[in-house]
Regions:
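N-terminal pre-domain/capping segments
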Residues: 1-129, 133-134, 164, 209-216, ...
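Acidic/histidine-rich catalytic cores of soluble enzymes
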Residues: 7-14, 146-268, 356-387
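Active-site-proximal loop/turn and secondary-structure-junction residues that shape catalytic pockets
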Residues: 18-20, 56-58, 91-96, 139-143, ...
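Short acidic, glycine/proline-rich loop/turn micro-motifs
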Residues: 24-27, 100-103, 147-150, 255-259, ...
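Residue-level preference for long, well-ordered alpha-helices that form the structural scaffold
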Residues: 29-33, 65-72, 109-113, 148-159, ...
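Hydrophobic residues within beta-strands of alpha/beta enzymes
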Residues: 52-53, 88, 135, 179, ...
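Active-site/pore-lining binding-face segments in mid-to-C-terminal subdomains
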Residues: 248, 256-328
Length: 387
């Protein structure tokens, strides 16, 4: 019987805001008792997680005094040590406080933009104190409901200026952060800048330090836009910009549901795990997901265990797919190579172009049947556990 227990090598992490979510939503209040960061660390230690991530105010309330901050940090460090947890990633809450109701780095108000930088610098210090090496930027309020309210070109310029500033700040302070940008098409704003992961992949080369910057794609956010998440992650991998990843699940075209990983679209989750494992992704596998609102405290533990267990099961099934003789024979069959033609098309040269123009390629003969139904059915049988 395979072992599906959490493997430390997988670097499974959860945010303080995930398992600590008391179940409130826009239509109803809290349904579970709020638990402290120390209690969350104890919970994650119990279920076998590798680490925990946080926004600055998940750990330290925005109005905490310096002595209160120091005590919170001290207590949390002890809880991390007691539970053998690490903090791989930190981020800033630039969306909850009323000051950010119309944006943070992209706000029309220079004082708000300055406060956003100040708050982020302090949050970066907090993350560095816990050893975080990835710093995520999710622009929760960076957007509009009406384009009459802000010039989108200026908004992008403002965002670039802020990131350039913070890159230099990280270098100056010796934090050695890698920045990871997280896209989302809407919610809480009606329309959000950098709506999908590809938006950030296009934006990063324009920065002063593109080598420091990558992406943190999230399953739910790309599904909200109706996109194939595996393809978004593949683009990030190919660009060498997959610095972090948020795993959860989501029905297409809905509000941000943040379901338990693999609970809504199992086939998509399978191909995601296969992609990450096939390409040797070595970063954190962060479950930015939430237990059902109906769950009690014990069921929240089941939720956390379920996220990790599903990943481990799909990892095993991906390995089985890769070694299934019938599947691999089909893969070989559908990938038709011609060494001479491949050599000609790999890099342009005038001579190569002439040879390709003169090549006797029969378009009618190229219309061949492909066994894709069979391949997909075999894939489904692997996922369903009958192969």
């Amino acid at each position: 019987m395979p072992n599906y227990d959490p493997d430390p090598k997988m670097k499974f992490t959860f945010g303080l805001w995930t398992v600590g979510n008391p179940g409130a939503d826009p239509f109803g209040g809290v349904v579970r008792e709020r638990i402290s960061p120390v209690q969350i660390a104890n919970l994650l230690g119990e279920v076998g997680a590798y680490g925990v991530n946080f926004h600055d105010n998940d750990l330290v309330p925005i109005d905490a005094t310096p002595p209160q901050r120091d005590q919170i940090v001290k207590d949390f460090k002890k809880a991390l040590k007691d539970n053998h947890l690490v903090v791989p990633m930190a981020t800033t809450n630039l969306f909850s406080d009323p000051a950010f109701k119309d944006g943070a780095f992209t706000s029309n108000n220079a004082k708000v933009r300055a406060y956003a930088l100040q708050k982020t610098m302090r949050a970066m210090e907090l993350g560095a104190e816990f050893g975080a090496k990835i710093y995520v930027f999710w622009g929760g309020r960076e957007g509009v409901e009406s384009d009459a309210t802000r010039n989108p070109v200026e908004a992008i310029k403002r965002f670039r200026e802020a990131i350039n500033f913070l890159c230099e700040y990280s270098i100056n302070k010796g934090y050695n952060y890698k920045f990871a940008f997280e896209a989302k098409p809407n919610e809480p704003r009606g329309h959000m800048y950098f709506a999908v992961t590809g938006s950030y992949l296009a934006f990063i080369p324009s920065l002063d330090h593109p080598e420091m910057c990558g992406v943190n794609p999230e399953v739910a956010h790309e599904h909200m836009a109706g996109l194939n998440f595996v393809h978004q992650v593949a683009a990030a991998i190919e660009a060498k910009k997959l610095f972090h990843i948020d795993l959860n699940d989501q029905e297409f075209g809905r509000y941000d549901q943040d379901f338990r990983f693999g609970s809504a679209n199992l086939k998509n989750a399978f191909f995601l795990v296969k992609l990450l494992e096939d390409y040797g992704y070595n970063g954190s596998r962060h479950f930015d997901a939430h237990a059902y609102r109906q769950s009690g405290s014990e069921d929240v533990k089941s939720f956390a265990r379920g996220c990790m267990r599903t990943y481990m099961i799909l990892k095993e099934k991906a390995a089985r797919w890769n070694t299934d003789k019938e599947i691999q024979a089909l893969i070989k069959e559908i990938n038709v190579d011609d060494s001479e033609l491949s050599k000609l098309s790999k890099k342009f040269a005038a001579s190569n172009a002439k040879k390709l123009l003169d090549a006797p390629l029969d378009r009618v003969a190229l219309n061949i049947g492909l066994p894709y139904e069979k391949l997909d059915q075999l894939t489904m049988e692997v996922i369903m556990g009958v192969r």
